[in-house]
């Protein structure tokens, strides 16, 4: 349904679906999902249905994983350094398929061990830098997956959604508690070359859960959940290995559960609806074998974002990135330039509230939220495989997109090893050197993982 503004105005921005009126067309999708699941169940097997269900659970698979991480943060803006020692225990159960449908359950438990000298966004230890791994037990997956569609699948329930490189939509797997989505998703390959995806998102389970912060803490912006009435749509066509084009439309109608509009956010983004946005974009990627173990790859992307639904801000900002890389034998090199525009006014910059933002713009996490003046990031990366492990070194130079001056520069490094199939170890650091009175920050991680 179009807003009155759209019906009576020539303004192109007015021709948008109202965020609070778009649920009407998600109901048929839910009905279709139910019909698809129902049609997959042969009537002849109705008498044995109870037995079949029992067998599906009996023949299911169970996995357990442990991930220990030590994180050290030295931030000049805080009086004390953070030392976080946490253990995540993950339990995953998946039923055997029944009528092309299976159930997935994932429970994560996160506990500080040895010590808790850090601000986990919940414990009130504001004298320490933030390490966003709060204590708690969370049901991160509870979904039904139907695979009876040739070339496609339907997923209903709490699920992981990772689109492309996770710049806009991702699960933030680096944090101990993942971001997951209560949604209905349809993933379909029309041909080997043409693929499409749609998801309606009703709620976002964020990395800060499962508990909300206390009302007395200045972290109300970091609620455990986003209420959502959002639509995610993308489609890609592969012309050749050198040319793959992807288009997307991400209509995010998000509301912070703790901050009924128009309560101000502590991070300067306005009200609880300030993360709502409409993003339309195109991404071109490709790779080419140059011979002699030498391979070339590239990416070029442009996206336009504007306010959406009940976002009180009125903005229209762009995003673009160009990237080129060369891989030779066990070595790689990449050069890239990324821009997220900003007008210089709080709440009027290009944001990616559902992205895996730790992957981008430096691992020190200074730019998880784009500053009002926007962000330009020139980066160089080198990778190598040696000594049985993988190594990566990245240099970033950060500056505002609007105005003059610099934010600073950063050096990131990671080394990782996998062994005996089930085990891995990772060491990683980030060194941010701030300019123009922006505080320096240094981070170090040591992580041990075991999955069975």
How should each PLM-predicted stretch be described?
Residues 1-54:
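Cleavable N-terminal export/targeting peptides
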Residues 42-85, 92-100:
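N-terminal, post-signal peptide beta-strand-biased segments of exported outer-membrane/organellar beta-barrel
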Residues 440-452:
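Outer-membrane beta-barrel "beta-signal"
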